[in-house]
Amino acid sequence: NDVEWFYFGKNGVPKTGPQEGEATTSDFISINNKKYLFNPLGVPVYGLQRVYTSRSKNDYTAFYFDENSRTSQKGKMTIEEEDGTKSTFYFQDTGKGYTGVKDNSLYYMGKLQKADEGTKYEVIHIPGGSSYVVNTSGKISKNSAGVKDADGTKYSTNSSGVLTKIDGVSVSGSDYGREANEPIWKH
């Protein structure tokens, strides 16, 4: 028995929102200090959602809405992505997917970034940010004079885990490594 519920405004009209995958943070509805997002039919959405943080189609991140309460969630959790993969995510108190280093782990749009299996270590670049050396568990390598990946490439990092050298050669700029993996979206 699937039950759907609606939220009616003071004018008696149900609150509605955009198509999934097209929402912006201004589409959120706050009810009793809890954040909701509604679809065009007025039904609150749930699951991992791509939400635009500005009018630019390049500015978006992940929010996660609980299947039962339909509210925006915060903190660290394991979520099944659209392709069935279970991944670790971290959401800020605002519900926004965290980007950066948290508890010595690297996150992008809330998703934990890990080196590919069999590589030991991998350089992962956060778009608009820095490149980090990460192991297969998602932990960054800090203050390292040289950790080696499975191919023997040696990486050095600073106290923040940012890549400083590859095979002893200083690197400048931040565009090294593979780009961080986005969450796997519904739409």
Regions picked out by a protein language model, each given a short descriptive name:
Residues 1-187:
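Extracellular adhesion/carbohydrate-binding repeat motifs centered on closely spaced tryptophans
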